[in-house]
Amino acid sequence: MELWRQLNQAGLVPPGLGPPPQALREVSPVEIPGQTLRTAGADTGGACDSLLWIREELGNLRRVDVQLLGQLCSLGLEMGALREELVTILEEEEESSKEEEEDQEPQRKQEEEHLEACPAPHPPDFEMMI
């Protein structure tokens, strides 16, 4: 499974998750050329046909499992690439916000100086009794 290997090398395999089952990593016995189902003796009431059907269905299920595993691995690799892209975007936004803060610093200082020049509101110097 090349995609699984790529996923593992990218560090995207969840911790504790081992390799795929051996049945998905090896060539299916159904796919081995020259391999046939042999029975000793006479056909016992269609048992051979049933076994062939079961074997064929198991092979179909295995193919579907391999396809699904491949799709999951592809999806994992794509998610890893998107995660890296997101990290890059967030870093760029952080840098631009720092630059904006640095650009706004002189303006803030001017506003503070202006506020210091204006006297703060305070209560009147006289008292009134009723």
Curated annotation (Swiss-Prot):
Residues 105-116 have a biased composition (Basic and acidic residues). Residues 91-104 have a biased composition (Acidic residues). InterPro entries: DUF4530 (IPR029202). Residues 91-130 are annotated as: Disordered. This is Glutamate-rich protein 4. The lineage of its organism: Eukaryota, Metazoa, Chordata, Craniata, Vertebrata.
